[in-house]
Each structure stands twice: as structure tokens, then as C-alpha cells.
Design a protein with these regions (language model features):
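Conserved GNAT acetyl-CoA-binding A-motif
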Residues: 104-114
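A short helix-loop-beta-strand connector motif used in the catalytic cores of GNAT acetyltransferases and
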Residues: 45-56
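A conserved beta-turn-beta hairpin within the catalytic core of GNAT-like acetyltransferases
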Residues: 71-79, 88, 107, 132
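Conserved beta-strand in the GNAT
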Residues: 56, 62-70, 77, 82
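Conserved active-site alpha-helix within GNAT-family acetyltransferase domains
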Residues: 94, 115-134
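Conserved GNAT-fold acetyl-CoA-binding loop/helix
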Residues: 20-44
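A short beta-loop-alpha structural element at the N-terminal edge
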Residues: 5-20
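Conserved acetyl-CoA pyrophosphate-binding loop and the N-cap/start of the following alpha-helix
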Residues: 87, 91-99
Length: 149
């Protein structure tokens, strides 16, 4: 099963698939990103034409997920990691992450996980990640005239 898991670097030919998977990631983690698939495709294109690289995880001929890494940051930054819904909780995430770290030759990598994504937090902690910061946001609610309530 996992011996067939392969990783490859994405190209522009993968953008449509990456956009669909990214949309599923946004939905699954209940992110507030409202971009549609076409907007996500264009954003992903911008990523992979800069210091980011996207990686597809394939088991045989089937795509089972992807990762997006910012290679300009030290340590490297894992911006997105997604395993397809129908193969979750079968060990693919663990194997894909370990193979990815080997593929990119990384000993240290950072990531952020949304505080309400308890499944994600549990996965990352089980993989050995440690809490390092608390990322916070203030959304200042203003009336239409620009004055605070």
C-alpha cells in the first residue's frame, strides 16, 4: 500500500487539481478564505512561480494529497498539507509527511494550524510537532460610516 506512495514536484499542468484540493482543504479546516476554485488556481500559480513548491502525493496512479512549502523561509514553512478525505485515517498522512521531509531533505519545518482544527492539531502533535507560538487576530467590527460601535 504505502510502498507505492510517490512524491513529485507540481507543474502548471497540476494547477486545476491543486485548486480543487486546496478548496477542499479550506472547507475541511473551516478557514474564512472565500476564494473560488479559479481564484485558488491563480493564487497557486503565483506560489509555484516564486519560492514555493507544491508536491503531489500519489499512490500508484491515484492522487492522495498535496503539500505546499515556502522554500524562502528558514526553517522551511509548510503552508498547506492535505490528504484526500476518502483515504484519511489510514496512515497516508504520516507516511506522506515523512516521505516529503526526506524528499526535500528537511530536518526542521514550521507550520501553522487553525486553533479550532482539533484533528489537525492532534495529527501534528502525534507527528512530533511542538507548540511554539499563539497567532491571534482582531477583527474590529465597524459600522458602515467607519466609526467603531
Amino acid at each position: 500500500m504505502f510502498q507505492d506512495l510517490k512524491i513529485r514536484v507540481c507543474t502548471d499542468d497540476d494547477l486545476d487539481m491543486l485548486a480543487v484540493l486546496n478548496k477542499q482543504l479550506i472547507e475541511d479546516e473551516m478557514h474564512d478564505n472565500k476564494m473560488n476554485v479559479e481564484q485558488l488556481r491563480e493564487r497557486m500559480k503565483g506560489f509555484i512561480h516564486t519560492d514555493y513548491k507544491a508536491y503531489i502525493f500519489e499512490d500508484g496512479s491515484r492522487t492522495i494529497g498535496y503539500a505546499l512549502i515556502d522554500h524562502s523561509r528558514k526553517p522551511l514553512y509548510l503552508r498547506q498539507f492535505f490528504i484526500c478525505r476518502d483515504v484519511r485515517r489510514k496512515g497516508y498522512g504520516r507516511v506522506a509527511l515523512n516521505k516529503l521531509l526526506e524528499f526535500i531533505d528537511a530536518d526542521v519545518i514550521d507550520l501553522e494550524v487553525l486553533s479550532w482544527n482539533t484533528g489537525g492539531i492532534g495529527f501534528w502533535r502525534a507527528m512530533g510537532f511542538k507548540d511554539r507560538s499563539i497567532y491571534m487576530r482582531l477583527e474590529n467590527k465597524r459600522e458602515q460610516d467607519g466609526k467603531a460601535p
